[in-house]
Structures are given as C-alpha cells and as structure tokens.
Amino acid sequence: IEFDNKKTKTKSIETDYTNYQIIKLDWTETNLKNPIKTVIDAYFKLHLLSNKFVLPNTINLDGLFEALPNVVWTNKGPISIDEIEERLNKSKCDKNDLYIRSLDKFPCLTDYIIPNKVRIADASRVRLGAYLSEGTTIMHEGFVNFNAGTLGKAMIEGRISAGVLIGDNSDLGGGSSTMGTLSGGNNTKISIGKNCLLGANSGIGISLGDNCIVEAGLYI
C-alpha cells in the first residue's frame, strides 16, 4: 500500500493457485469518502486503518457489515461457511488437523498485519481495522475493535469499542469498557485523553480529557 507519501514494505506476491487473483487498486481521496460497496472496498479500508495510513473515524465505513461475508476463520486460513462442513469431515478422516478459531465477518489483525513495537497477548481479541500505535500493550482481557485504537503508548486490559480512541500513556484496567457506536443507540464517538486511568471494571459513555481517573467499578 502506498498512500499520502507513506507506504508499507514492498513484497512480491506469487501464487500457484489458478483461482486466486491479485487485485490492484488506484484510489483517490474521493474513494475514502464513499460508502463501502464491495468486499474489496471493505478490506482495503480496514488495511488502511491497521497500517495507520488513516486515523479512526476519518474515512467512510458505511456499508461495511453489508459488504463483508461471514467467514470461518481456521488454522488453515479463511474458509467459506458453505465449504466448512466438508472440510471438517475430510480433516477428521485424515490427520484431524483443521480447527475453527471463529465465525465472524472480521479476521484477527495479526492474520494480515504485524504492528511494529506492539504487544498483543491474545491475538484473537484484536480485529483487523484496529489502529495500534507503537508502545501499545494489549493484555489477555483487552479487546480492540475495528475503527478504534490507541494514539500513543497505552496499556489495554479492557475493551476499546468501535470508534473509540485512547490517548498516549493511558491505561484501561482489567474489565473496563468504553461505549462504542455499534449498539445501544450511541452516536457519540468516545475518546480518552493522555495520562488517564480507567480502574478495573469501570466504564465510560462520555469522553475524557487529559489526566483523568475513573474509580474501579464506576460507570460514567
């Protein structure tokens, strides 16, 4: 990917599979503002976010859920739901080496991108489309949705919901939560400033500025 004078590392892509196709996209800023209509649009925008070419909440993701199919994510890669039963039966007859990790529209971030200078204790809890700045640590109970993430070093032991941004040197304690925009009728995008702490099992439905502390167990 090459975008806004930045680009990912160059890699040559070769495949022996005749049913695979390498797709080249040539987008302008207008494409970023347009709703998502195809799977290609969806994956490209998610890659732009996770490669940190664009910040969360700055590109149009309308139509994302409609465009993405539900996929069986396995240790052998993505498999169509229509094919998984046959593949599982074949696996059991052979070495039984196929197992399912999830049934979801979104893959794990690390299936496609390895973020630089970031720790992720449980890769299944960070979706493709997450924006993780260098120095971020996601512990086992931490979760980061797509179109959300960190803007600096952060310790994440709670949930970063879709649309939420966490400032530099902030800490989300174990079991803490931030209200996203995907459910509950919330249209307000939540952000947390720098040097903030959400105590264990706390939560917020409002944005916080810098140097804020929310007591453990308290929901605001």
Feature locations, PLM:
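Terminal amphipathic alpha-helical/low-complexity segments used for targeting or macromolecular assembly
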Residues: 1-111
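Acidic-glycine-rich active-site phosphate/pyrophosphate-binding loop
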Residues: 112-116
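A structural motif detector for beta-strand N-caps
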Residues: 118, 124-126, 130-132, 136-138, ...
